[in-house]
Design a protein with these regions (language model features):
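Residue-level signature of mid-helix packing/kink "hotspots" within the transmembrane helices
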Residues: 9-17, 67, 101-102, 210-214, ...
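Conserved MFS/SLC helix-loop-helix module at the cytosolic interface between two early adjacent transmembrane helices
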Residues: 13-52
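Paired small-residue
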Residues: 38, 42-45, 53-61, 259-265
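Cytoplasmic helix-loop-helix junction between adjacent transmembrane helices
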Residues: 52, 58-99
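Helix-loop-helix hairpin linking two adjacent transmembrane segments in secondary transporters
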Residues: 54, 91-137
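Juxtamembrane intracellular "pre-TM" segments in multi-pass secondary transporters
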Residues: 140-170
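A late C-terminal transmembrane helix in Major Facilitator Superfamily
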Residues: 280-320
Length: 349
C-alpha cells in the first residue's frame, strides 16, 4: 500500500509539470473540468478492481486531479494585481484545503473499519462528482493571454530554472512542505511504535496538527497584503523552527511524549501556513505571464521533494527507534527555508 502512495505522488509530480504550461495554452477551466471527470471515472474503476495489480495501476489515475490544486493557485494569481494580494487569497484557499488532511485520516479509518476499504473510495467519488458540478457551473476562464503553442510554453521552463529568485522561493515552499511530508511519512510509526497509540485513535492524532496549518493560513490571509510575502515567509519559518526545536530538545533530554511531539507539529503547521502560500505567490509573481507554468513546476518540485523526504522518514525509522530521527529530519527541512528566503530577499533588492 505504501508503494501505491509513492507511485501516486510520483505521477502527481509529473502531471503538474505538464498541466502547468498546458493551462497557459488552453486555459484553466477546461483542464479543471476534464481532470475532475477523469478522477471520477478512475475512482469507479478502483472501486470495482479485482486484484492488487489492478488497484496499483488504477491508483495513479486520480493523481491527475492534482491539476486542480495547481490551477486554483494560478487562478488566484490571474485575478489579483500583486503578489501580496495573491498570497492573501492563496492562504484562504489553502486554509479550506487543510480541512481534508485534518479530518480525512480519522474519517477514512472509521469507514475502513466499519464498512470496508471501498467505502473510502465511494466517499471520494461522491465528493468528486459534487466538485465537478460546482466547477462546471461556477469556474470561469481567468487566463488573460494564452500562449500560441505548447512548445512555446514548455520553452519557458529554462527561463524559470535560470531564475535564482524562483529557485529561492521554490526551495522555501518545498522544504517547508517537506517537513510536513516527513511528518506524514513517520508519524504513524512514531505514534504506534514509540508512544503506543491505538490504531483507532492514531488517525486523530496524526490529523490534529493540521489545525495549526489552518490558523497559519488565516493569519496569512489577514496580513500578507499589509506585511508582504517575504516578511510573512520569514515569520512563518521562525515559528516552525521554534516548534520543532522545542520538541527535539524535549526528546533529546528524555522528556518527549505524544503531546509534545504532536503538539509541536501544530506549531510547525502554523508556521507553514504562513510560509507556503506566500512563497508560492512570490514564486508565481516572478513572471505573471507564465503563472500556470511556474505553479506547475514549483508544485511538482514540492511534491517530488516531499515524497522523497517521506521515503527518507520511513527509511530512518526502524524498530527500536525513538521520535528523534524524524524530528531531526524535520528540523533540517525547516532550517533550509531560512537561507533560501533570505537569498530571495537579497536578490529582490
Amino acid at each position: 500500500m505504501c508503494f501505491s502512495v509513492v507511485l501516486y505522488l510520483a505521477i502527481r509530480a509529473v502531471v503538474q509539470l505538464i498541466f502547468g504550461p498546458l493551462s497557459d495554452l488552453v486555459g484553466r477551466r477546461p483542464l479543471i473540468i476534464w481532470s475532475l471527470v477523469l478522477f471520477c471515472i478512475s475512482t469507479v474503476a478502483i472501486i470495482f478492481s479485482q486484484s492488487a495489480g489492478q488497484f496499483f495501476v488504477l491508483r495513479v489515475f486520480p493523481a491527475v486531479c492534482a491539476t486542480c490544486m495547481v490551477l486554483s493557485r494560478a487562478i488566484v494569481r490571474d485575478t489579483t494585481d500583486s503578489g501580496q494580494a495573491a498570497g492573501s487569497r492563496i492562504a484562504y484557499v489553502t486554509m479550506g484545503m487543510a480541512i481534508v488532511p485534518m479530518v480525512g485520516p480519522a474519517m477514512g479509518g472509521r469507514l475502513d473499519s466499519f464498512v470496508g476499504w471501498t467505502a473510502v473510495w465511494w466517499a471520494l467519488l461522491y465528493l468528486g462528482i459534487a466538485i465537478l458540478v460546482i466547477s462546471f457551473f461556477d469556474v470561469g476562464e481567468t487566463m488573460r493571454t494564452k500562449s500560441k503553442s505548447f512548445s512555446e510554453q514548455i520553452s519557458t521552463y529554462p527561463m524559470l530554472l535560470r531564475s535564482k529568485r524562483f529557485w529561492a522561493y521554490c526551495i522555501s515552499s518545498a522544504c517547508a512542505s517537506g517537513a510536513f511530508f516527513s511528518y506524514l511519512g513517520g508519524a504513524p510509526f512514531v505514534g504506534s511504535e514509540v508512544f503506543g497509540i491505538a490504531p483507532r485513535e492514531l488517525g486523530i492524532w496524526v490529523g490534529i496538527p493540521a489545525i495549526g496549518y489552518v490558523f497559519g493560513n488565516f493569519i496569512s490571509g489577514r496580513f500578507s497584503m499589509k506585511i508582504g510575502n517575504d516578511i510573512m515567509v520569514l515569520l512563518g519559518v521562525s515559528i516552525s523552527l521554534f516548534g520543532v526545536s522545542m520538541s527535539l530538545s524535549l526528546s533529546v533530554f528524555g522528556l518527549g511524549s505524544a503531546i509534545s511531539f504532536f503538539g509541536s507539529v501544530i506549531v510547525v503547521g502554523l508556521g507553514n501556513g504562513m510560509t507556503v502560500p506566500n512563497s508560492t505567490a512570490a514564486m508565481m509573481s516572478i513572471n505573471q505571464k507564465v503563472a500556470g507554468t511556474a505553479a506547475g513546476l514549483g508544485s511538482s518540485i514540492m511534491i517530488g521533494g516531499g515524497a522523497s523526504l517521506s521515503a527518507v522518514a520511513n527509511f530512518i525509522l526502524v524498530p527500536g527507534s525513538s521520535e528523534v530521527p524524524l524530528l531531526v529530519l524535520m528540523w533540517i527541512s525547516v532550517f533550509v527555508v531560512l537561507p533560501a528566503v533570505l537569498y530571495a530577499v537579497y536578490r529582490g533588492k
